[in-house]
Amino acid sequence: MTGFLGRAQGLGRLGKILEQAGKPRVRGCALASVSVLSLVVMSVAARAQPTGGSVVAGSAQISSSGASTLINQSTSKAIINWQSFSVGQGGSVQFNQPNASAITLNRVTGTSTSVIDGAIRANGQVWLLNPNGLLFGNGATINVSGLLATTSDIADQDFLGGRYNFSSTGGKGGISNSGSITASNGGSVVLSAPSVTNKGLIAASAGHVAMTGKVWRS
């Protein structure tokens, strides 16, 4: 899969996972303990949707109707900065992308945790970057070509240039999954934060799943 998992050396079990994926370099990783994750989650309306979306690179159109948000992307990569990115129960976010290797980078610039309790669907890859943390609730159903959920960040030009060097934001947010995350055949799922908890289902047939600690720029 053309994507975000990459070559790494001397990282034990995680390093082997990344070696098998054979994509960009990440260093300074450690497997996160699957422990109780403390997330201070702000009250989110039952039908909350992403807000304040601004396309800062690539070509994409954002439209919303009720509890549904649609992103039509026509370039292989796009960057969207959001004030907040949550999906309430019964809500959905649909990404229509050129192909399975296309990537939409969604960066939260506000101060709230992303609470996903609805559906995210994409025929390509979805990256969710939020230094405040991400919570996939019991109602979350994610069906994508590939998913990266992280509290780290990446420079726009690095992302666009295929240099997938992530840096810590210094935030204390974590990631918790109690829902269902599915990557298409050969796809990958990566959850990366200071602490990561998985109590749900993560499936990546013939692909890779990784839960990592802090990811530092190489």
Task: Set out the residue ranges of the language-model regions.
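Solvent-exposed adhesion/ligand-recognition segments of exported proteins
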Residues: T2-S218
